[in-house]
């Protein structure tokens, strides 16, 4: 009888061997991609053989004046369409906007062109006509998928459409702690409180502006402390491993609050004009990086861990962290 079992045993061992070496699911992510500047970073990202790419905002630079005329934004999208590499069309793409693809620098709920801007955004990213984003105000959404037994829940926030007006001038914004001041707005908060309850092993939360950073002079969640406190409480109460992705800053960094990590990946091709990387923050883990960069996340279902890294334009490692999936 033994000869009959040996082939089956051999095939079983081969199967187990292949399973143990299953490739992690790879997600690259980044922000701040100017259509008028060369984009050499794409060839580097292609070498990582990613499964998906997340655009975290400022995916074009098409600011118009506050009148809501969108000629500049339309032209920016048209030019960017010819700049994005063809291989991206073979990957899963997830995108949110920030101010420069919203249409107004640091713009919020009062921007007159926001409805038409949303239509331009959805059409550019080829969002299917039956997608809820065509019927709602704002571009927030969620998406679920499973890789190697890990249930991943992607939650994408809109930090522009409903956001209250900023208090103060550019680079001198003041804290807005009014009870009614908001970033997400009532409808989006209600939606978030529902979808975040979905069964998942890993939550990836996309926000165009930084959630954890507090020290710099630019836009951030901490300008609206009540909103930030509400978000951190929501995340803190989760039993699910949660990672926050953000952009906007034209510099990159990794932050940690309790058990929550935030990775800011910015910029893909428009790095900070302020070359110093000396920015500090109580939640910042490493020195910030001010040249072109992108983020890379590896979801390893075999070992139940997530590895996320910041990489430079040549694909060299800047910083990396690894966390276990609960």
What do the predicted segments below correspond to?
Residues 1-8:
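Bacterial N-terminal signal peptides that target proteins for export
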Residues 14-17:
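N-terminal signal peptide c-region/cleavage motif recognized by signal peptidases
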Residues 21-326:
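Metal-dependent phosphoester/phosphodiester hydrolase catalytic core
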């Amino acid at each position: 009888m033994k000869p009959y079992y040996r082939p089956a045993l051999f095939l079983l061992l081969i199967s187990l061997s292949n399973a143990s070496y299953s490739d992690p699911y790879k997600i690259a992510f980044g922000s701040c991609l100017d259509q008028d500047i060369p984009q050499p970073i794409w060839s580097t990202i292609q070498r990582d053989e990613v499964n998906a790419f997340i655009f975290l905002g400022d995916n074009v630079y098409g600011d118009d004046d506050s009148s809501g005329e969108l000629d500049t934004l339309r032209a920016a999208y048209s030019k960017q369409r010819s700049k994005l590499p063809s291989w991206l069309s073979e990957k899963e793409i997830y995108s949110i906007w920030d101010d420069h693809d919203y249409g107004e620098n640091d713009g919020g709920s009062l921007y007159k062109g926001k409805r038409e801007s949303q239509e331009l955004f959805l059409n550019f990213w080829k969002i299917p006509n039956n997608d809820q984003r065509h019927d709602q105000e704002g571009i927030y959404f969620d998406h679920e998928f499973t890789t190697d037994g890990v249930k991943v829940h992607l939650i994408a926030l809109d930090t522009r459409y409903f956001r209250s007006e900023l208090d103060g001038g550019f680079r001198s914004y003041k804290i807005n702690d009014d009870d009614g001041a908001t970033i997400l707005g009532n409808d989006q908060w209600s939606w978030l409180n529902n979808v975040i309850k979905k069964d998942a092993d890993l939550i990836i939360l996309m926000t165009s502006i930084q959630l954890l950073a507090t020290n710099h002079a630019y836009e951030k969640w901490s300008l609206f402390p009540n909103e930030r406190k509400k978000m951190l409480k929501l995340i803190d109460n989760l039993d699910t491993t949660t990672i926050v992705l953000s952009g906007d800053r034209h510099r990159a960094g990794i932050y940690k609050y309790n058990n929550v990590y935030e990775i800011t990946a910015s910029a893909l091709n428009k790095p900070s004009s302020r070359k110093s990387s000396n920015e500090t923050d109580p939640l910042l883990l490493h020195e910030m990086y001010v040249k072109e960069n992108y983020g890379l996340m590896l979801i390893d279902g075999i070992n139940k861990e997530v590895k996320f890294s910041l990489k430079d334009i040549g694909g060299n490692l800047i910083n990396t962290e690894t966390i276990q999936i609960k």
